[in-house]
């Protein structure tokens, strides 16, 4: 079973997404955070338990790429999916340059989100 870490500041979205992932037979949410500070603590405490991180970009106390930078600086190769409402023509390239593996809009379907997660867990870009 793949263990997922969620960083999302909107509680209702984070809880709904965690519930969705928890209903999948191959996925388990092992940590959740609603802010960059909380995410840094959770990631440090549970680094060995995380198989994939789903990271929101725009947070009340920073940008999700700061957590990605921290993970990469610590030598983590855990795949990272940025799931955001932000838009921009160069956003995918930018988040990848910051260490993320893929970017997906929060407007994506549930099937697209689950497919992207499973693709990244298999070691490929979505």
Predicted segments with their positions:
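Active-site residues of response regulator receiver
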Residues: 56-57, 84
């Amino acid at each position: 079973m793949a263990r997922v870490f969620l960083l999302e500041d909107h509680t209702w979205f984070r809880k709904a997404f965690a519930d969705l992932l928890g209903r999948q037979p191959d996925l388990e949410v092992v940590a959740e955070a609603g802010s960059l500070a909380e995410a840094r603590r959770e990631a440090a405490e549970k680094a060995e338990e995380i198989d994939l991180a789903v990271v929101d970009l725009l947070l009340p106390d920073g940008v999700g790429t700061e957590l990605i930078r921290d993970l990469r600086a610590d030598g983590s190769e855990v795949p990272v999916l940025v799931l955001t409402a932000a838009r921009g023509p160069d956003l995918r390239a930018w988040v990848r340059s910051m260490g993320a593996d893929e970017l997906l809009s929060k407007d994506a379907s549930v099937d697209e989100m689950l497919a992207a997660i499973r693709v990244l867990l298999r070691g490929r870009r979505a």
